[in-house]
Amino acid sequence: MAEPTLASGWYPRLVVGLGNPGKNYGRTRHNVGFMVANLLAVRLGSKFEVHKRSGADVVNGRLAGCSMLVAKPRNYMNESGQQVGLLAKLYSVTPADIIIVHDDLDLDFGRIRLKLGGGEGGHNGLRSVAAALGTKDFQRVRIGIGRPTGRKDPASFVLENFTTAERMQVPTICKRAADATELLVGLGLEPAQNHVHAW
C-alpha cells in the first residue's frame, strides 16, 4: 500500500490497539486492544494493511470529525513500542495525541476507563510504549479484564482465552471501548471521561 498520508490541515491522532500477533493469541485477554482496533477499522470503512516503514498494521481515515491513524503493532507485546514510536515520528504525532487501547488487570471485567499518563501496572506493552516515546504522558483506553483468582500467575492469565461466559460479553465490551475511543478523539479527555465513567 502507499504510505498513509495526512492532508494539510488535518489534526493527526494515532490510536494503537495493543496485542500479540498470530492466531494463537487472537482470543486472549491480552488482545482485547487488537479487537477494538479491528472494530475501529470497520467504522473507518477500510482494512488493515502493512505499513512498510514502521512494520505495523495500519488503517487511516476520519472518525468523530478528526483524522486518525489506527495501528496494531506486528511485533510482540513487550516490543510494541518500537513500531508506535516509529509511527509517531513519521507522522509528527505528539504523545498527548496518541491513544493506547489496552487490557487492564486492575479494572473489573468489562469496565472502561480513560486516563492520561500514569504507571504501567505491570503491562509490558505500556512499558514498551513509554520507553519508545520517552514519556508516560499518552492517553489510554483501559479495558478491564479483572484479576485471576487464587494463585494463578497474572502473566499466564492474560495469555489465556476469555472464558465462555466472558466471550459472550466481549463484543459489547469492545463496542463500548470503541465508542469511548471515538469520544476521546472527538471531545477530549475530561468531557469523554464524564460520559464514559458514567456508563
Swiss-Prot record:
Enzyme superclass (EC): hydrolase
Record PROSITE patterns: PEPT_TRNA_HYDROL_1, PEPT_TRNA_HYDROL_2
Any single GO BP term: rescue of stalled ribosome
Positions marked as site (Discriminates between blocked and unblocked aminoacyl-tRNA): N20
Keyword tRNA-binding: yes
Catalytic residues in the record: H30
Principal subcellular localisation of the protein: cytoplasm
GO molecular function: peptidyl-tRNA hydrolase activity; tRNA binding
Catalytic activities: an N-acyl-L-alpha-aminoacyl-tRNA + H2O = an N-acyl-L-amino acid + a tRNA + H(+)
Record keywords, A-Z: Cytoplasm, Hydrolase, RNA-binding, tRNA-binding
Annotated binding of tRNA, by residue: Y25, Y76, N78, N124
The UniProt record lists the keyword Translocase: no
Recorded superkingdom: Bacteria
Subcellular location: Cytoplasm
HAMAP family reported for this sequence: Pept_tRNA_hydro_bact
Its job: Hydrolyzes ribosome-free peptidyl-tRNAs (with 1 or more amino acids incorporated), which drop off the ribosome during protein synthesis, or as a result of ribosome stalling. Catalyzes the release of premature peptidyl moieties from peptidyl-tRNA molecules trapped in stalled 50S ribosomal subunits, and thus maintains levels of free tRNAs and 50S ribosomes.
Matching PANTHER family: PEPTIDYL-TRNA HYDROLASE
Subunit: Monomer.
Protein name: Peptidyl-tRNA hydrolase
Gene: pth
